[in-house]
Amino acid sequence: MDPAMCSELLSFLKPETRADVRAQALEYILGVSGTPEGRQSLCAEPRLLQVVLDLTTEQSAHIAQDAHHVLVNLTSDPTTHKSLLGHVPTLLPSLLTLLQDPTCPFSDSTCTALCNLSREEESCQSFLQTLKQEGLCQLLHMLCTPKYNGHASLDYLGPLVCNLTQLPEGRDFILDRDRCVIQRLLPYVTAGSTVRKGGIVGTLRNCCFNHRDHEWLLSDQVDLLPFLLLPLAGGEEYTDEEMESLPPDLQYLPEDKERESDPDIRKMLIETVQLLCATAGGRRIVRQKGTYLIMRELHSWERESYVSRACEKLIQVLIGDEPEAGLENLMEVTVPPDLEETFTRVDQEDEGSLDQ
């Protein structure tokens, strides 16, 4: 941005300037933040960024709202994150304070900006360092408290927590056996908006990469599997013998039982179950719980090819032979790079042919 233009905007945004002039200047910045070039130019101006952040608490609702929208636009571009966090060290603490305020009318925008900032691993690491244990506990409390903020849905808390679990520290918090964190999330697999549910299911999927926790996750202490299978189950009839093999929560479902309507969430649920099959103990429990029956009926019902493909992969594991000795833990098997490339290419070709 031209230095003269930046100085002029800063003069228009001073607290003593008339509110209508400040509003017009901020509207201009909001427009600039809507393009990739504009975002890069704004992120090169630390003083301007700080002023925009300060305006998120402006008494004028219109100005505060536009300031939030500018930050949402800026954070939507991953290439800006390093500049934003470097030029404005108070950005993360300030946004977290706004998010945790149950009276803030713009918390949905704040949550979206933080969700954007936590997508990339490097900025996510900065976020976790800012949050610390107390902040993580507060985020979970907000996520599990209906109407925590009467002015905002806070649906993007789901994807935000999911982003944090891309890192081992985030997963370790959710999987803390003393805090019973993951158990508090399970009811929300089938409750709330698609955005919130998708974030919760994504969190569970990320946590299942910690293969040493699989048997605990499948034990009665957590009982994760029924929560994953219920959204995938319909109202199909089973034989008495088949019904007995299913977890109690999946037995005798009503004929009008509907499956999860979002195909991306269905795919994530299937992938989460497949991750639990990566260990010998996990495969044994998943098979014993009648998972194949749910997948069989889902595959017959499913109309989205990419979800059907995920279903087929899981079924292959469920009905396949056990790996040879020494290869029981699929997450610890080293795949040569050339074979990995071949498998990836075959998967892409299969998905392409299914979409045609």
Curated annotation (Swiss-Prot):
InterPro entries: ARM-like, ARM-type_fold, Hgh1, Protein_HGH1_C, Protein_HGH1_N. It comes from the Eukaryota. SUPFAM superfamilies: ARM repeat. The gene is hgh1. Pfam families: DUF383, DUF384. Belongs to the HGH1 family. It comes from Xenopus laevis (African clawed frog). This is Protein HGH1 homolog. Gene3D superfamilies: Leucine-rich Repeat Variant.
